[in-house]
Amino acid sequence: MTYTTLVSAAALAANLDHPHWRIFDCRFSLADTAAGYKSYRQNHIPGAVYADLNKDLSSPVQPYTGRHPLPNIELLAAKLGDWGVNNRCQIVVYDDAGGAFAGRMWWLLRSMGHTQVAVLDGGYGHWRKRGLPTTAILPKIAASGFRSYLDDRQWLSANQIETGLASRSIRLIDARTQERFLGKAEPIDPVAGRIPGALNRPLQSNLDRNGLFLSPDQLRRQFSDLIAPWPAERVVHMCGSGVTACHNLLAMEIAGLGGSKLYAGSWSEWIRNKNRPIAGDERTAKSLT
């Protein structure tokens, strides 16, 4: 069986020794960028390799980019090969944040043409609650070859977002918390607020009280109401830096609403240009008076 959105803890546990399965630990903390790797070295799912959001799943920040620019795809493909991934592998990614960081790797692999990738439902916390095995032993990896192509239709630039909103040809959904979206709090970026015309769907809305994804039917109803009358193919997801937005994109895929896109630069790129409009903060309020 091939998994392309979610995989359960039970299914992963049954395939830990499968020769064509590869597991990646994507735990990360924006507040302490070394914390994820430290946690990985202490314990992780057997066979898992650590994929660092900053070092592996992003490229260096530039003056014109957001906080997590997309990685160099050729370099990432080479790393995947070094990590034992080939084009036949079933890949499983996990974190301890409800899929907020693992979703980035899920989306990247799909954009590179590898659809056999799934997020571990419930993440590492659910895995441990079920008493499933963990280890501190680093896996021994035999390098392989991973061929990829880049489907640049899967994300939009800032200029495309401006054009799409002006022409009302896209529906933009922001995965940040409501406080950040409304501009009431901004603990990370230097400017608070939102892109005018965007709607808010905090990623936590996709999970139940146990940290598992809602059912496909529940997600379908909620997203259908949110995006109407736009079709899924006209929906674009954003967040602070193009990472947690992938959670909403994943949720739509689970719901059977495929084809939505990512604004890769997201809010932290948008505010680099002071001429771009923003809403919900003091600067916008002054400009309207």
PLM feature segments, named:
Residues 1-289:
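Cytosolic catalytic domains that perform sulfur/thiol-centered chemistry
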